[in-house]
């Protein structure tokens, strides 16, 4: 009788533990499962979302809080309150914390690259401003933030360098300097280049060339973040896989960052450039109440297909991160046109896991890892 009771208790405990397993547990020892957080989520204003975050993810990135426009809106005046809270949340929950992003042409404070007359500053002035910003921010979180998106979106679709203010003033040297400045202040932090549209052949080649150039000059770069902004048609999974292989072969880790998949129709291509906005058109907002079953099935099948790809390349991929917790969090509700209702993330608006997530949690999505690329 006693033995039967113990067996029953053990069985119930196993079932309960199985029920509480999250995405991070299902991919344990394959790659980190990450998610982007808002300030409100860090402040625990939505306790049910907090539980999802703690259960399913072991890596976090701030959606906006650590961008330069938020951290240093005026030269020399840093606002660390929200960033401190974000980092503290990660430390309390033993998560791998990502800093996003140190140098980016967008969401950049107006003063950063120009003087009081609005003219480009000299190369020396910009170098000093870059160094002061990077080393103040990285230095504050030394040993706490484990990886930094050092430079974000500096390469165009044709593989050339984006003609940003940084490039106008410093040329491609601005990228080298950003990585150097970050490494100087925290030699143990991982340093990444992050960009969208990485499935494109010319952009892929441009990023590989960038990585090889940094390595040739003995400048530390640990990984490439492939922003996973997807749709029901783009990107082509075979081309996406080619990029994973290319970046891994260049000698860096690969991360799937900012992963989401729009379920809505598009007439403007696959851009994730936040300046590429459109006027609202109801034609491109057809699912205001719910997602039709057929569209939902297609969406989940495609998300599962990509997740299987990530598992297959888990010897090259170190992290897979969703760009938000649930559908209501997604930036795609307001990009490229504001006021749409999209269904882009792993959890629904009522915080239920999508079918492809359920399959992962039930152990039904598995893929043997390929040998690590040399």
Language model features by range: what are they?
Residues 17-59, 63:
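Boundary/entry segment of secreted carbohydrate-active catalytic domains
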Residues 19, 23, 119, 140, ...:
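Aromatic-rich peripheral "rim/lid" segments of glycoside hydrolase catalytic domains that contact
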């Amino acid at each position: 009788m006693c033995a039967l009771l113990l067996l029953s208790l053990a069985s119930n405990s196993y079932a309960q533990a199985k029920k509480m397993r999250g995405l991070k547990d299902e991919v344990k020892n394959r790659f980190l499962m990450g998610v982007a957080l808002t300030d409100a989520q860090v402040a625990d204003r939505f306790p049910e979302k907090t539980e999802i975050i703690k259960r399913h993810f072991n890596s976090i990135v701030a959606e906006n809080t650590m961008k330069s426009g938020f951290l240093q809106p005026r030269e020399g005046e840093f606002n660390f309150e929200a960033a401190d809270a974000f980092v503290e949340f990660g430390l309390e929950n033993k998560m791998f914390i990502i800093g996003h992003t140190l140098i980016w042409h967008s969401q950049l404070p107006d003063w950063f690259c120009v003087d009081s007359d609005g003219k480009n500053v000299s190369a020396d002035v910009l170098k000093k401003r870059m160094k002061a910003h990077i080393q103040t921010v990285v230095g504050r979180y030394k040993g706490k933030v484990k990886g930094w998106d050092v430079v974000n979106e500096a390469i165009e679709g044709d593989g050339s360098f984006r003609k940003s203010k940084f490039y106008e003033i410093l040329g491609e040297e601005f990228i080298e300097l950003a990585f150097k400045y970050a490494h100087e202040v925290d030699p143990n932090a991982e340093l990444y280049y992050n960009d969208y549209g990485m499935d494109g052949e010319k952009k892929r080649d441009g990023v590989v060339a960038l990585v090889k150039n940094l390595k040739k000059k003995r400048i530390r770069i640990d990984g490439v973040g492939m922003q996973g902004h997807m749709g029901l048609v783009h990107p082509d999974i075979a081309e996406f896989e080619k990029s994973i292989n290319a970046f891994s072969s260049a000698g860096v880790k690969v991360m799937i960052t900012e992963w989401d998949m729009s379920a809505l129709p598009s007439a403007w291509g696959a851009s994730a450039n936040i300046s590429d906005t459109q006027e609202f058109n109801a034609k491109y907002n057809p699912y205001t109440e719910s997602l039709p079953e057929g569209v939902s099935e297609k969406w989940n099948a495609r998300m599962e297909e990509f997740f299987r790809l990530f598992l297959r390349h888990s010897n090259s991929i170190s992290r897979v991160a969703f760009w938000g917790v649930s559908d209501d969090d997604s930036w795609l509700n307001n990009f490229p046109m504001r006021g749409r209702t999209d269904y882009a993330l792993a959890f629904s608006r009522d915080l239920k896991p999508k079918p492809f997530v359920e399959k992962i949690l039930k152990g039904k999505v598995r893929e043997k890892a390929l040998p690590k690329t040399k």
